[in-house]
Amino acid sequence: MKFIGFIAAFLMIGTIILPAQTYKPAERVYVKTSDYVKGHFNGETPKKKATIWVIGDLRDDINEVLNGADSTPVRYRYWRKDNKTLWMLNSVARTMSITAGVVVEDGKIVDITVMTYRESRGHEVQSRHHRVQYVGASITSDNNLTNSIDGISGSTLSVNSMKRMARMALLLHNDATSDD
């Protein structure tokens, strides 16, 4: 009888402790960075990644885009060939970050792809139907996208995160190519 009581106590404690552990959904890696970079630079990877420092007006613009959702990094690394730039950006959706690759050419988005998705829900942002809305978008003088992006029911925070990354990539591209 004592043995049964011991087992019952063990099972009750186990059901209390296990749910208290932090739940972390599995990362969904859709595309590897090296494959994505090669795919947008004709099978080649530019020899050296460039760096852009976030200072002055650029910092103010990025802070406006992030609106407190993420902290503003001091610098961003990117790949560049002629007037095409490729950015790997992270943005928090609900609790976890999304990593997206954004390709910008001549001030317009050519491609946006979810590289790694870490949230437990909202993964629909990686669908082609959603991503195609960003193609051809540029940034307005008040740092908004020129294209209207439709939301996805149940994925509002993930959609907002993707919009932030698209806007950031356009701002960064414009600053990086302004010397030309």
Where are the language model's segments positioned?
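Positively charged n-region of N-terminal signal peptides that target proteins for export
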Residues: 1-6
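Bacterial N-terminal signal peptides
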Residues: 7-15
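Flexible, solvent-exposed loop/hinge segments and secondary-structure transition points
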Residues: 21-149, 155-156, 160, 164-180
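Sec/Tat signal peptide C-region and signal peptidase I cleavage site
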Residues: 16-20
